[in-house]
């Protein structure tokens, strides 16, 4: 089975037109999915690189997603949305309906099981009512009992962080992290992200049994310079790394 490569983009960074053009320009067959991050006032589990992309919060609204979603649909590229519960909780119903109306079917909520565990079960139920599946977000610090509970409450693939946040470099044994994740979650596809530093890390994840990777921090500087070519080249390097690992 082909290993999956997901690319994270913060909507509105560096500007709305660039993001739409970038999604249109990425060569066919390279990216399996885009993670579209809703700009956050408190992206607490993102590292410095991704956090820097959230400065355009006041210049983005959900209507700006429409062009990107049309392009991805036409190109048959899967899309999920990443949003912090701290940003959508106060107007949860309208936000979920707006996403559902745009045929968004998968959502990652990094702070849900950590900071809002008391509302997580009810939120997952409301997601299901609007046709959206929660993609559980775990990392090496997530207790097994929490993983088991939310694996049983969901049916999507799993997002598993190598690190507690993106763009940081705490020493970690990648093979051990992947093997532990697979032992606790034996029957679901697991995509690893949050802390992949280079192609070597990506290869090690796949060789240890991971089903794919998600990258974002690696291309932030290129996006900030409006350099589509450099960002695409980095994505190609990760594609080649995971393809050669099989």
Predicted regions and their residues:
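Active-site-adjacent beta->alpha loops and helix N-cap segments on the catalytic face
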Residues: 16, 40-68, 88-93, 111-129, ...
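Conserved N-terminal beta1-alpha1 strand-loop-helix module at the mouth
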Residues: 1-77, 150-155
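Generic structural signal for hydrophobic
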Residues: 25-26, 72, 98-102, 126-127, ...
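Metal-dependent phosphodiesterase/phospholipase catalytic core, i.e.
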Residues: 59-104
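Glycine-rich phosphate-binding active-site loops on the catalytic face of alpha/beta enzymes
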Residues: 32-43, 102-113, 158-168, 208-228
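Hydrophobic faces of well-ordered beta-strands that scaffold small-molecule active sites
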Residues: 5-9, 34-36, 79-83, 107-109, ...
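Alpha/beta catalytic cores of nucleotide-metabolism and tRNA/nucleoside-modifying enzymes
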Residues: 183-188, 197-203, 207-246
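Catalytic cores of alpha/beta
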Residues: 16-28, 94-96, 141-153, 192, ...
């Amino acid at each position: 089975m082909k290993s999956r490569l997901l690319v994270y983009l913060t909507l509105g960074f560096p500007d709305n037109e660039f993001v739409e053009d970038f999604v249109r320009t990425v060569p066919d067959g390279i990216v399996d999915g885009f993670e579209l991050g809703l700009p956050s006032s408190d992206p607490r589990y993102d590292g410095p690189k991704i956090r820097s992309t959230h400065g355009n919060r006041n210049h983005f609204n959900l209507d700006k997603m429409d062009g990107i979603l049309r392009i991805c649909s036409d190109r048959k590229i899967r899309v999920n949305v990443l949003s912090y519960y701290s940003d959508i909780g106060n107007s949860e119903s309208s936000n979920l309906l707006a996403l559902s109306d745009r045929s968004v079917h998968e959502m990652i909520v990094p702070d849900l099981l950590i900071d809002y565990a008391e509302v997580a079960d009810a939120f997952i139920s409301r997601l299901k009512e609007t046709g959206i599946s929660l993609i559980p977000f775990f990392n090496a610090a997530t207790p097994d009992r929490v993983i088991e509970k939310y694996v049983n409450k969901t049916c999507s693939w799993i997002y598993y962080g190598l690190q507690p946040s993106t763009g940081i470099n705490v020493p970690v044994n990648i093979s051990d992290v992947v093997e532990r994740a697979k032992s606790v979650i034996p029957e679901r596809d697991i995509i690893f992200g949050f802390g992949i530093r280079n192609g070597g890390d990506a290869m090690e994840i796949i060789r240890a049994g991971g089903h794919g990777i998600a990258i974002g921090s690696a291309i932030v500087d290129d996006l900030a310079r409006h350099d589509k070519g450099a960002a695409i080249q980095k994505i190609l390097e990760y594609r080649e790394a995971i393809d050669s690992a099989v």
